[in-house]
Amino acid sequence: MKLSSQTINVLKNFSTINQNLVIKEGSSISTMSAMKNIIAKATVEETFPKEFAIYDLNEFLSVISLFSNPELDFKDNFVLITEEGSSKSSKYWYSDPSVVTTPTKDITMPSTEVTFDISSDTLSEITRAASVIGAPDMVLENGELKVTDKKNTTANDFTLKLDVPKS
């Protein structure tokens, strides 16, 4: 299986939410922050043949980046990463799912009111800001993405203006 650039970008974005991940059989990927206050779900074009866990998603993505055109072959206990016409290969072992933070239930999201794209860099920046100021909440309001503590009106916050269509 080859991973599309869109799927690689989804995984990069998810790595900013949580460094570990369980990918279930199928084409839906979801993650949850360690504090369990951020949940993300994406449907990708690939269909994963089996469920597997990755302990360090950034490391996994770095291993994939060692190949120009990686081919992933999902085995029982590891994924074999190769490249056609190359002598390179990597055996990347799956993690024990019990040590990985993952949503325990299927995420059922309400119908969307607003949709927008957010870059990996922007998500990384806002997540870093939340960590720096200790903000547990992320709020999208009036085209701005803000991290803050909604329970504390005098809490520090950090805001990024986004290009979000007005409804």
Model-derived features: where do they sit?
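Acidic/charged, solvent-exposed loop-and-adjacent secondary-structure segments enriched in E/D, K/R, S/T
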Residues: 100-102
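DNA polymerase processivity clamps
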Residues: 1-94, 109-167
